[in-house]
Structures are given as C-alpha cells and as structure tokens.
Swiss-Prot record:
Name of the protein in its database record: Biotin synthase
Encoding gene per record: bioB
Pathway: Cofactor biosynthesis; biotin biosynthesis; biotin from 7,8-diaminononanoate: step 2/2
Pfam name, any one: Radical_SAM
EC id: 2.8.1.6
Reactions catalysed according to its record: (4R,5S)-dethiobiotin + (sulfur carrier)-SH + 2 reduced [2Fe-2S]-[ferredoxin] + 2 S-adenosyl-L-methionine = (sulfur carrier)-H + biotin + 2 5'-deoxyadenosine + 2 L-methionine + 2 oxidized [2Fe-2S]-[ferredoxin]
Species for this entry: Granulibacter bethesdensis (strain ATCC BAA-1260 / CGDNIH1)
Keyword hit for Iron-sulfur: yes
C-alpha cells in the first residue's frame, strides 16, 4: 500500500463525490488491510482546566468572550486527575486525554501537567494532552514526562479558517504540530464539520491533514455541538451521510491513522455510528462528557459495540 503525502484537493473532492456504496467499499478494504475491523480503541477525555480561554474559536463554549454559562476554573489537582484516570481505566479506556482551555501553557503550570502525565503512565495507560500552542522546549518537556499523544486540531480548511478563528493562525497550528513531531510525540489532529464550511473546505481539511510530513497517528473527526452563546449556534447540522463520507475519505487518505468519532456522537443514532465504523472509524471517546459537552453513556457504547460484534482495545 502506497502512503501518500501529495493529495490534491481535486482528488479528495472526487473521493467525497463517489457513489456512497463505492466509497464505503474502498474505505473498508483499506481499513481491513491496516487494522482488525472488529476493534475500537477507547479514550477518555477530561477537562483539567475549564473556561476562561482568551481565544475566539466561534464553536467553543470555553471562550471567555462568549456567554455560554461555562464557569472558568483553575487547573485541577494532580490527585483529582489521577482519580479520574483510574476510573477511566476501570471502565475500559486505554488512553487518558487531558484538555486545558489555554492559548498556550504557562511555565508555572508545566510541572503540574508533567506530573499528571507521569501519573497516567504509571497506571499503564497511554497519555494525551491538549494545551494549546507549544514552544519547542515545552514539547520536549512533555516528551520527557512520557507523553504519548498531543492533540492540536486544524479544525477546517486553510481558506475557511479565518471565518472561525482570528486569535491564532493556521500557521501557528502547523508550527505547534511541527514542535510536537520534532519532540517525538505522536500527533492527534483532525477537524470539525458543521462550521458553515462547504464541500471544498472539507476536502481542504483532508488535504491539509493527509499532506503533513507524517500522517497524524490519530485523526478525530468532530460534528459541531452547538452551544447557546457561541457565534455558530444555529448552523445547519451536518448530514449523516456527509459525515460518514468524511470518515471514509480520512481512512482512504491516512490508512494507518486511528480515525476517531469525537464530539457530536451523542446526537448520532446507533445506525449512523455503525456506518462510521464500516467506513473506517476505529476509535471513540468513552464517558458521558467531552470537556464541556455531552457524550453517550458508557453503557450505551458497550451495548452498541456488543450488538455489532466489536470489541474494545
């Protein structure tokens, strides 16, 4: 199988436009060649520092400038975070992800975050954090603490990005991804559907991800969760078939990545999620909350995966 980093927008758009059965057939064939299609990797996500963010991401309820009812909190204590990690492991999660609503981490907080990472690793779990923009030295410190994955999404295409965020550039995001990669940390990077973008923008997001020097090890695909008080409240919801198409094209263009169903899954039917798994999704977030928005209950996920004959890893 040839791994490519030279996808054109026209090629990706042609994949998105394929007849649905043909697209799923191609994606499923690649998925089976690279993974056991019965396995789903489970991650749990915890907000270790909520709200008060100075950024203006139009989808985000944690932005300080939007009145969304999210109260700003301080960075959690290490022992409280590790208690949550133990509970996540007991529930079946193999990776514990920690998110902080920062533009970038302050040096005074790095020691605490590194201690959290070390504690999660000591539990025998994979660790992931999302802390905003990083310097090269901060990325190295996280690596030294044992960090496995760093999440930093591109969100949308380079062309549409300015309609969603003005407080950091696309190049800022790419620079952080380069620091993470140079430090030897696995990259978790994806995007969000339902921001008002067009099909060309969705193709542009895939091109930006698939043409990185190395494909992300993890690619979260989110459907916008609309929150009252954010500028994107009232957007047209993403069509289910269009969402599945993006999962399939992510699988085709990034064969060895874990493609994760992320935000927005609570609103999906079991049948929609089954189509996503058929199209190549093989990771989900587990637990009733993703940072500040809802997520399916663990019992519902276990029941669905059991019905589908799939297993957690």
């Amino acid at each position: 199988m040839v791994i490519r980093h030279d996808w054109s927008r026209e090629e990706v758009r042609s994949l998105l436009d394929l007849p649905f059965p043909e697209l799923l057939f191609r994606a499923a064939a690649i998925h089976r060649a690279c993974f056991d299609p019965r396995e789903v990797q489970i991650s749990t996500l915890l907000s270790i520092k909520t709200g008060g963010c100075p950024e203006d991401c139009a989808y985000c309820p944690q932005a300080a400038q939007y009145d969304t009812g999210v109260e700003a909190s301080r960075l959690m204590r290490v022992d409280a975070v590790l208690e949550e990690a133990r509970a996540a492991k007991a529930a079946g999660a193999s990776r514990f992800c920690m998110g902080a609503a920062w533009r970038s981490p302050k040096e005074r907080d790095m020691d605490t975050v590194c201690e959290m990472i070390e504690g999660v690793k000591a539990l025998g779990m994979e660790s992931c954090v999302t802390l905003g923009m990083l310097t090269d030295q901060q990325a190295l410190r996280l690596k030294q603490a044992g960090l496995d994955y760093y999440n930093h999404n591109l969100d949308t295409s380079p062309e549409y990005y300015g309609a969603v965020i003005s407080t950091r550039t696309y190049e800022d995001r790419l620079e952080t991804l380069a620091h993470v990669r140079d430090a030897g940390i696995n990259v978790c990077c994806g995007g969000i559907l339902g921001l008002g973008e067009g099909l060309d923008d969705r193709a542009g997001l895939i091109v930006a991800l698939a043409n990185l020097p190395r494909h992300p090890e993890s690619v979260p695909i989110n459907a916008l969760v609309q929150v009252e008080g954010t500028p994107l409240k009232g957007q047209e919801p993403v069509d289910t078939i269009d969402f599945v198409r993006m999962i399939a094209v992510a699988r085709i263009t990034m064969p060895h990545a874990r493609v994760r169903l992320s935000a927005g899954r609570e609103a999906m039917t079991d049948e929609a999620q089954a189509l996503c798994f058929l199209a190549g999704a093989n990771s989900i977030f587990y637990g009733e909350k993703l940072l500040t928005t809802g997520n399916p209950a663990a019992e519902r996920d276990r029941a669905l995966l059991s019905r589908l004959g799939m297993r957690l890893v």
